[in-house]
Amino acid sequence: MSHVIEGLVETSCNLGILRTDSDIWTGVVSLRSSRQDQLLAMKEKFYILSGMNQIEMQVFSEYPGWEYREESALRQRYCAVYQRLFGKEAGIEAIHAGLECGIFARAIPDLDIISIGPDIVDIHSPGERMSVSSVQRTWELLLAMLEEEESAAGERA
């Protein structure tokens, strides 16, 4: 669990697939963490356990962590634009999920990143659904953020 955000799962692993083929067992484990150091530590534990038990382990793909930053100018601007557009405070939520933001954060460590999107429920299930009106709000918010950034860039020039 996160020591920074109450209730947030920080690191987890999931045995998603277990197959048998003759005398060969294959397991597919998904590791996930918002902290890259914890992800690497968990992967190392799997290597140690597999070595102790004469099990071959292969890494097929990796998804980098995206650690929450307490200070974010972009998040502050987002909250201000959200307040101006919708007349209420933006809901800020950290989630335990693999997001593409981690890929960008690993490639450009100082990049200030936020993730926004429409309201989606029952993700990755047969009942998954999305609020169409929230898609419209997200679009309006994105346009307003880009317009504000364009204005700020013009003032800096």
Model region roles, listed by residue range:
Residues 32, 44-49, 107, 130-133:
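Short, solvent-exposed amphipathic alpha-helical segments in soluble enzyme
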Residues 147-157:
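Generic C-terminal helix-cap and adjacent flexible tail
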Residues 43-61:
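FAD-dependent oxidoreductase catalytic-site/capping-region signature
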Residues 14-18, 26-36, 55-75, 102:
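A short beta-alpha structural unit
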Residues 10-12, 16-26, 85-146:
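Zn-dependent metallopeptidase/amidohydrolase metal-coordination segment
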Residues 36-42:
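Short, conserved charged micro-motifs
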Residues 1-12, 46-52:
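Acidic-enriched catalytic cores of C-N bond-cleaving enzymes acting on peptides and small amides
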Residues 1, 68-84:
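Short, low-order "capping/linker" segments at domain edges
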